[in-house]
Amino acid sequence: MRLLTRPAPAAPEVRRPAGVPHWLPSAPCTPGHCLAGTHAEVGLPRRVARCATGIAVVAVGLALAPLVRCCRPALRGRLTRAWARAVPAAFGVRVRIRVSGAAGRLPTGGVLVVANHISWLDIPLVAAVRPARMLAKSEVASWPVLGALVSRGGTLFIERDRLRSLPATVARIASVLRAGGPVVVFPEGSTWCGRRHGRFRPAVFQAALDAGVAVQPVLIRYRLQGADPATAAAFVGEDTLLASLLRVTAARGLVAEVTVLPPIPSGAHPDRRSLARAAQRAVTGPPSGPQDRHGPGPQDRGVSGVN
């Protein structure tokens, strides 16, 4: 086991990149500041094995996606959840999925699933809880591997730099929800390192109000062998997908904790801002009495297209 040690630099000055519209969400998290620290690493052979296994699992999922879509909904859901749990496990991440005592059964039918956003791993982690269509920025479609994966999953894309396209996107989400389909959104609109959270943007919550469906909050946390929140899985700032992948496969004892929190009835809130605040409080606050559901198993880098 090798111990990686880097001094943590001073907090970065938050600057919005030139030419980026002021309404686009951004986070102060950067690789140089948030990813510095000390964590144990596995040896090179295990890293190579993890990379190869992870890429193989993703490739199998891409190849079988057309066949899985032809299956009955119940079987399709089981296969998708099993594959989604296998992806992080293949990259060396232990997965723990929990359901808060008050949450009861996992959601079915039309529901707006909202989660905090830290890493590209968030995508399969949420799918392991509830397979659903996802809202993502249009740039994700061109990402290597991940782009093809989310595109085949029926992702709803949005051009974030075109503010006028937002109402149409909200209407599309509401249409999917009315038809009984779940939709996943990362309402922070950008990835954060996991030690802090961003504000939940209210726009997409209008879709839940229009469709009359509940909001399902999900909390995602990454830890190293039960320690405080770890940033090894974070995909922030000017980080590249390759650098993030290599960091994940090198980490020893990385655990992803996914907690399903009690659903929030949209009708209990007068407007989207109130609903967004309620969802944010649920996610950023400590979960109440979670129970195990499954065993182990400033440049925006998020996938979300939320404004």
Predicted features and spans:
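N-terminal signal-anchor transmembrane helix
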Residues: 2-4, 66-128, 136, 295-300, ...
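A cross-family acyltransferase "interaction/gating" segment
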Residues: 145-147, 162, 195-270, 278
